[in-house]
Structure formats: structure tokens, C-alpha cells
Amino acid sequence: MNRIFYAFIALMALASCANSYDISGTSNVSTLDGRMLYLKILENNDFKNVDSCDVVHGQFHFQGSVDSMKMANIFMDDDLVLPLVLESGSITVKLDDTQQVVSGTPMNDKLFGFFKKYQQIQNQLRELVHKHDQAIMNGSD
């Protein structure tokens, strides 16, 4: 009976680890150092705090459990820093002056792959608008 009890406890401990997230982040943005970041999810048209942490020497860390995959956002005070998919696994966040990247889990890899492709399309659109404007200025509409 004792063995069954310990086996059950061990099984429950392993099952609880399967639904945990671990977000490790780095940043070279100097204004973030010493600031508090908040991990929030949208619930009933309002953002609910899930976790918070301090940025120390450009590093921050969120950790907890999640029952299902959810869209979440990292905020600094009331300012949105970036969106991510809150799912079980190890998530890596990189914030710098030129880009924001989240990776390490399947849905975050897909989400930021989409953002990267979207940015490429936006850049192509700006280039086409610039060429169009140049053609108008040159009189070759």
C-alpha cells in the first residue's frame, strides 16, 4: 500500500511538471534595468496579472504552471512590451533596440515566424510605395 501511495505521489509530481512554463529573458535595453515586468493574460476584457519579475542586469525570469495554451503579454507598468504564447515548456525572450524575439516552444516559434514574415511584407510594401512615389515625381506614372 505504501509503494502505491509513493508511486501515485511521484506520478502526480511528474504530471504537474508537464504543464509548467519557464520564461527566461535577456535585454540590452538600458531603460528596462531595475524595472518590473508583468506577465498578463486577457480575461473578460481585462488584463489579469499572472506573474511579475524584476529586470536585473538585463535578465528576467517568469515561472509557473499553465493548464492550457493561452495568449499572454509582457508589460512594463501599463505599456505592452510584447505578446507571446503561454504554453508549457522553456520559453526564451530576447529584447533589444532593434527586435523582440520569443522562441523555444512550438507555438511561439510559429508566432514569431509569422511576425518575421509580416515584417518582410511590410518592408516590401514600403519599398513599392517609395518606388511609386519616385515614378510620380519623375513623371513616369
Label the predicted regions:
Residues M1-S27:
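Bacterial Sec-dependent N-terminal signal peptides
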Residues C17-D141:
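A non-transmembrane, solvent-exposed segment enriched in polar/low-complexity residues
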